[in-house]
Amino acid sequence: MGDSLWRYYFGVLVIACKVNLSRALILDSIYWNTTNTKFVPGQGLVLYPQIGDKMDIVCPRVEGGSMEGVEYYKLYMVPLEQLKSCQVTKADTPLLNCVKPDQDVKFTLKFQEFSPNLWGLEFFRGKDYYIISTSNGTMEGLDNQEGGVCKTKSMKIIMKVGQNPSDPISPKDYPTSYPPKHPDLGGKDSKSNEVLKPDASPHGEDKGDGNKSSSVIGSEVALFACIASASVIVIIIIIMLVFLLLKYRRRHRKHSPQHATTLSLSTLATPKRGGSGGNNNGSEPSDIIIPLRTADSVFCPHYEKVSGDYGHPVYIVQEMPPQSPANIYYKV
């Protein structure tokens, strides 16, 4: 009964986890070079990954061993302010180094809320994450900290985790007003900020909030089912272990030898006194009554075995010094 119940709950746990993981997708790989047409001028590449999805950012290999068309980049994950200005700092750690043109180098992004790795990336629903490169594609400009292909080629990735394309842009992350355009800027700044323009439709906002809340509720239900199933399985395992432990202890007690305390005899072999002579000539040993007394703290582990294996009980008599006449009894 317990074994079948354990299998049932284990099956429920596996099914719940499969339902939760079936939503995970492997997104198309992003090739980081200037020939990739997915980078929209003035906007970059906007993605909508969900929790559990995976995506590779690939530094493509140059075919034929030719050095023509070789591009060198360093990719960084930056906050919104650095995305707008296309800047990085010395404290920023590169996410990916594209410095080996003779082989494919890639970095896999796994969109998970909790990472088992101490240095792993963690993503949260409803938040935006940004990847840019301030390198200009050459080895000399590999360590540039400003501009680069982020500004000239709009090579930047905006990842809206756990969101939908119909969701509005959050006003807390993006400004609601913009400075006027200046003709001397040539429209570069305005183009680079096109992705930052908010959607002003109130109906779209309500729809986006509804989709977002429904997806969050669904994922929470699946997670709760996994946790509940795992908890039930752990409880069943604990109960089974306790039951087996009690059963083992009962068997151990049943097979262990049972010891009993023994009784020792305190004997006083005093002759029966006559009326005049005071001797015991002619008296029989059966006329002497020997009192029995339980000896304190006396333990004989062989007593039960002797009395059970050899017929009549055998008593172990302890020799004691003569005692006072008060302990002597006479047969009348």
UniProtKB/Swiss-Prot annotation:
SUPFAM superfamilies: Cupredoxins. Residues 181-210 have a biased composition (Basic and acidic residues). GO terms for biological process: angioblast cell migration involved in selective angioblast sprouting; anterior/posterior pattern specification; axon guidance; axon target recognition; blood vessel development; blood vessel morphogenesis; cell adhesion; cell migration involved in sprouting angiogenesis. A motif (PDZ-binding) lies at residues 330-332. Residues 25-161 form the Ephrin RBD domain. Coiled coil: none annotated. Residues 260-270 have a biased composition (Low complexity). Inducible phosphorylation of tyrosine residues in the cytoplasmic domain. It comes from the Eukaryota. This is Ephrin-B2a. It comes from Danio rerio. The gene is efnb2a.
